[in-house]
């Protein structure tokens, strides 16, 4: 379908008929949004079911892949699904009308394909080439499109109106002496309201409505038409031509009034110049010029507002649809002020500790520099944003949205260290936050005006001081590009008066949730959590924005089924070599294995205990952090509870890929069979950043999932699903390599089952 054939000639329709059709199209668009929400809900349920079961490779295990029920050897053995070939129990089956059955996940996939109409779109794509053009869009564009003859008719009508004005110009000269000041005052007020967009262009007499995409050449064609229709050189014609020439300029010599798109009001110099005119011929010509300018500015304003291009989703929205990145936290400033438990937890989201150890790796040094820099630069650490006073005259559009270039714009906070690491302090959450949320459909701008907070908790009990700031995310995206922050305000009733801005289409905004959290900033320690608010935009009313108080809520750790988010997959191969098999290796090979156990003294020529080999094979569908849709990723590994920095293993950095292949082996020695039940293999994937903190892309933990390690309760023994099965399979088959594909966690915080 060519571009010209995408329009239908609907010029025969009257205005009320077009309005009725547009009303039907609007209802159709609303129903489509409702249907999209229903399909998204079904897709989320399907994703949750897949995540619950995981991608398992069952060779000898007798476990149902979905409900994890242990299968019997004779009775209730389970059968492989006819679609996915995974073994499931009798309760995880869905029988069809023809008697065949599928597992619950495959049945949901088939049901989603039918309900969403995907099968119809596939059949349509086979028969028709242009499947991306909807009939409703064609009708809507055809109605809003101006017919070819309407432009000429409009020019003729405007030219006739201009001729009528020239006929009455002589009478205007006579009345100037008596009511000139009143006329000028009225026109000036009319000009001010026109520049603000308050004057509405009247409908033409033909009964046809102007389209929303008028050309910018309309004004020029009007002036050329008005000049060509008049052949005589009377005084009134000369006056109209002179007025037309002055109107077409960007600034007027008689009034000094600049004609620009973004001018809200005329300057003081312009008003003074106009009011200081003397009566007579020049005065009447100025009045006619201003009157024409009012109408033309009104039309130009309507063209500019309606001719705004379609909303372009920012790079933040596109790249962050599936991203929830977290920052690799390394040494921070003045770590010796607080007690710590491990260095490992400082580099893993889920725990923030502050130890001061020797810098061994390059990225650790960079993280230390960035942390100190952010701590010393108060303005940068608290976010790059500008204030707007509460009583200031703020420029707003027709939806009560501040202009994008006003003094309420907020920028990304790129120099701060993330607080979303699972350690929120022990401050009791109290207080409320006052917000004004609005959305501009023309520019796709979401504006969160943070006014103030009241009755906040005290952030520092020793100093009885609260240095509060507000941080926001559009969930599920928690990447650095999606974070906004206000400046730091002192007191338990701080006044912020700052606007946090996001650029996102309204369709995507309906799938997002705004998370606003209040934090106490500690220059030499960790920030304390003071409360948060989560606002879902799926049913939010943007038509009537108003100020609203929201009660701050404490941080709630969600269950894994709710907080899980797809971050990609990691393929690894595990092999445990027990001590008895390790002893048969030659002495030279034993010494070579000894080298891989970093941080231990090489006093003994033999290795005590067994060896754990972890082959880091590859990853798929990692989060794209770089601007080109890629990441520079590497894997970091610990064998807990041994979390010393000297025992950390790292792969090389694979640049510019979201599907990296490392083919690197980690070797941990000194492991006995009883240690396997109490140890935990923690693997995290990071994006390498040259001059800032590394970005967390996902991770896994492999252990028995008992929650206990050597008789102590620990939060990192929390494996479940495929992580737990792969670790148990390795322990049950010593000396044998076992391969598994693991779903990456979006956060390394404790998973509560």
UniProtKB/Swiss-Prot annotation:
<feature type="domain" description="RabBD">
    <location>
        <begin position="7"/>
        <end position="123"/>
    </location>
</feature>
<dbReference type="InterPro" id="IPR000008">
    <property type="entry name" value="C2_dom"/>
</dbReference>
<keyword id="KW-0597">Phosphoprotein</keyword>
<keyword id="KW-0863">Zinc-finger</keyword>
<dbReference type="InterPro" id="IPR041282">
    <property type="entry name" value="FYVE_2"/>
</dbReference>
<feature type="compositionally biased region" description="Polar residues">
    <location>
        <begin position="380"/>
        <end position="391"/>
    </location>
</feature>
<dbReference type="GO" id="GO:0006886">
    <property type="term" value="P:intracellular protein transport"/>
</dbReference>
<feature type="compositionally biased region" description="Polar residues">
    <location>
        <begin position="214"/>
        <end position="223"/>
    </location>
</feature>
<feature type="region of interest" description="Disordered">
    <location>
        <begin position="297"/>
        <end position="359"/>
    </location>
</feature>
<feature type="region of interest" description="Disordered">
    <location>
        <begin position="145"/>
        <end position="279"/>
    </location>
</feature>
<feature type="modified residue" description="Phosphoserine">
    <location>
        <position position="147"/>
    </location>
</feature>
<feature type="zinc finger region" description="FYVE-type">
    <location>
        <begin position="64"/>
        <end position="106"/>
    </location>
</feature>
<feature type="compositionally biased region" description="Basic and acidic residues">
    <location>
        <begin position="195"/>
        <end position="206"/>
    </location>
</feature>
<keyword id="KW-0677">Repeat</keyword>
<dbReference type="InterPro" id="IPR013083">
    <property type="entry name" value="Znf_RING/FYVE/PHD"/>
</dbReference>
<dbReference type="InterPro" id="IPR043567">
    <property type="entry name" value="SYTL1-5_C2B"/>
</dbReference>
<protein>
    <recommendedName>
        <fullName>Synaptotagmin-like protein 5</fullName>
    </recommendedName>
</protein>
<dbReference type="GO" id="GO:0016020">
    <property type="term" value="C:membrane"/>
</dbReference>
<dbReference type="GO" id="GO:0031267">
    <property type="term" value="F:small GTPase binding"/>
</dbReference>
<keyword id="KW-0479">Metal-binding</keyword>
<dbReference type="InterPro" id="IPR010911">
    <property type="entry name" value="Rab_BD"/>
</dbReference>
<feature type="region of interest" description="Disordered">
    <location>
        <begin position="380"/>
        <end position="404"/>
    </location>
</feature>
<dbReference type="GO" id="GO:0006887">
    <property type="term" value="P:exocytosis"/>
</dbReference>
<dbReference type="InterPro" id="IPR035892">
    <property type="entry name" value="C2_domain_sf"/>
</dbReference>
<dbReference type="InterPro" id="IPR042783">
    <property type="entry name" value="SYTL5_FYVE"/>
</dbReference>
<feature type="domain" description="C2 2">
    <location>
        <begin position="597"/>
        <end position="717"/>
    </location>
</feature>
<feature type="compositionally biased region" description="Polar residues">
    <location>
        <begin position="150"/>
        <end position="174"/>
    </location>
</feature>
<dbReference type="Pfam" id="PF00168">
    <property type="entry name" value="C2"/>
</dbReference>
<dbReference type="Pfam" id="PF02318">
    <property type="entry name" value="FYVE_2"/>
</dbReference>
<keyword id="KW-0472">Membrane</keyword>
<dbReference type="InterPro" id="IPR011011">
    <property type="entry name" value="Znf_FYVE_PHD"/>
</dbReference>
<feature type="compositionally biased region" description="Polar residues">
    <location>
        <begin position="249"/>
        <end position="275"/>
    </location>
</feature>
<dbReference type="GO" id="GO:0005543">
    <property type="term" value="F:phospholipid binding"/>
</dbReference>
<dbReference type="GO" id="GO:0008270">
    <property type="term" value="F:zinc ion binding"/>
</dbReference>
<comment type="subunit">
    <text>Binds RAB27A that has been activated by GTP-binding.</text>
</comment>
<feature type="compositionally biased region" description="Low complexity">
    <location>
        <begin position="224"/>
        <end position="237"/>
    </location>
</feature>
<feature type="domain" description="C2 1">
    <location>
        <begin position="429"/>
        <end position="550"/>
    </location>
</feature>
<keyword id="KW-0862">Zinc</keyword>
<comment type="function">
    <text>May act as Rab effector protein and play a role in vesicle trafficking. Binds phospholipids.</text>
</comment>
<dbReference type="InterPro" id="IPR037303">
    <property type="entry name" value="SLP-4/5_C2A"/>
</dbReference>
């Amino acid at each position: 379908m060519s571009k010209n054939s995408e329009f239908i000639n609907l010029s025969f329709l009257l205005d009320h008929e077009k309005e009725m059709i547009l009303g039907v199209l609007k209802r159709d668009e609303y129903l489509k949004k409702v249907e999209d929400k229903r399909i998204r809900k079904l897709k989320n349920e399907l994703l949750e079911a897949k995540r619950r079961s995981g991608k398992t490779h069952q060779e000898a295990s007798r476990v149902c892949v979905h409900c994890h029920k242990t299968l019997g050897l004779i009775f209730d053995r389970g059968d492989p699904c006819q679609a996915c070939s995974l073994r499931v129990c009798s309760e995880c089956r869905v029988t069809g009308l023809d008697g065949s059955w599928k597992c619950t996940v495959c049945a949901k996939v088939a049901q989603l394909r039918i309900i969403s109409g995907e099968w119809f779109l596939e059949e349509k794509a086979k028969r028709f080439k242009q499947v991306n053009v909807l009939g409703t869009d064609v009708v809507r564009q055809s109605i809003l499109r101006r017919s070819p003859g309407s432009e000429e008719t409009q020019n003729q009508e405007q030219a006739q109106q201009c001729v009528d004005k020239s006929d009455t110009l002589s009478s205007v000269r006579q009345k100037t002496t008596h009511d000139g000041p009143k006329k000028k005052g009225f026109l000036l007020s009319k000009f001010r309201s026109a520049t603000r967009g308050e004057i509405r262009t009247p409908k033409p007499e033909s009964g046809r409505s102007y389209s929303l995409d008028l050309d910018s050449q309309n004004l020029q064609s009007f002036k050329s038409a008005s000049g060509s229709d008049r052949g005589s050189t009377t005084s009134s014609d000369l006056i109209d031509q002179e007025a037309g020439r002055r109107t077409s300029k960007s600034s007027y010599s008689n009034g000094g009034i600049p004609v620009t798109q973004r001018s809200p009001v005329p300057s003081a110099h312009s008003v003074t110049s106009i009011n200081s005119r003397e009566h007579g011929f020049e005065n009447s010509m100025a009045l006619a010029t201003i009157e024409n300018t009012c109408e033309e500015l009104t039309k130009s304003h309507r063209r500019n507002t309606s001719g705004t291009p379609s909303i372009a989703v920012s790079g933040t929205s596109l790249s962050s649809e599936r991203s929830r990145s977290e920052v690799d936290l390394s040494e921070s400033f003045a770590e010796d002020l607080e007690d710590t438990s491990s260095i490992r937890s400082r580099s893993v989201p889920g725990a923030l500790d502050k130890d001061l150890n020797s810098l061994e790796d390059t990225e650790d040094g960079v993280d230390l520099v960035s942390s100190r820099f952010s701590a010393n630069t108060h303005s940068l650490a608290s976010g790059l944003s500008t204030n707007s006073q509460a009583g200031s005259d703020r420029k707003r559009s027709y939806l009560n949205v501040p202009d994008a270039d006003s003094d309420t714009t907020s920028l990304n906070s790129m120099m701060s260290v993330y607080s979303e690491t699972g350690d929120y302090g022990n401050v009791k959450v109290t207080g409320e936050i006052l917000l004004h949320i609005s959305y501009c459909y023309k520019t796709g701008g979401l504006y969160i005006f943070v006014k103030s907070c009241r009755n906040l908790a005290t952030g520092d009990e020793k100093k009885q001081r609260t240095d509060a700031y507000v941080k926001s995310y559009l969930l599920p995206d928690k990447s650095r590009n999606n974070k906004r922050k206000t400046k730091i305000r002192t007191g338990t009733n701080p006044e912020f008066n700052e606007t946090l801005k996001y650029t996102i289409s309204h369709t995507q905004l309906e799938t997002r949730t705004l998370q606003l959290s209040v934090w106490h900033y500690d220059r030499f320690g960790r920030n304390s959590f003071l409360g948060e608010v989560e606002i879902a935009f799926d049913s939010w009313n943007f038509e009537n924005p108003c100020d609203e108080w929201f009660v701050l809520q404490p941080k709630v750790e969600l269950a894994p089924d709710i907080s899980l988010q797809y971050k990609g997959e990691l393929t690894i191969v595990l092999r445990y070599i027990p001590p008895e098999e390790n002893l048969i290796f030659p002495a030279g090979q034993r010494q070579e294995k000894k080298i891989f156990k970093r941080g231990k003294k090489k006093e003994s020529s033999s290795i005590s205990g067994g060896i754990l080999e972890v082959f880091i094979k590859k990853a798929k569908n990692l989060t794209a952090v770089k601007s080109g849709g890629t990441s520079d990723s590497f894997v970091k590994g610990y064998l807990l509870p041994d979390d010393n920095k000297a025992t950390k293993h790292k792969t090389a950095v694979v640049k510019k890929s979201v599907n990296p292949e490392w083919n690197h082996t980690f070797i941990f020695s000194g492991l006995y069979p009883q240690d396997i039940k109490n140890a935990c293999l923690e693997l995290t994937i990071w994006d390498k950043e040259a001059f800032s903190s590394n970005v967390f892309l996902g991770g896994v933990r492999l252990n028995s999932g008992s929650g206990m390690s050597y008789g102590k309760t620990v939060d990192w023994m929390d494996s479940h699903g495929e992580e737990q099965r792969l670790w148990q399979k390795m322990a049950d088959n010593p000396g044998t390599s076992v391969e598994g594909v693991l779903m990456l966690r979006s956060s390394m915080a404790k998973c509560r089952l």
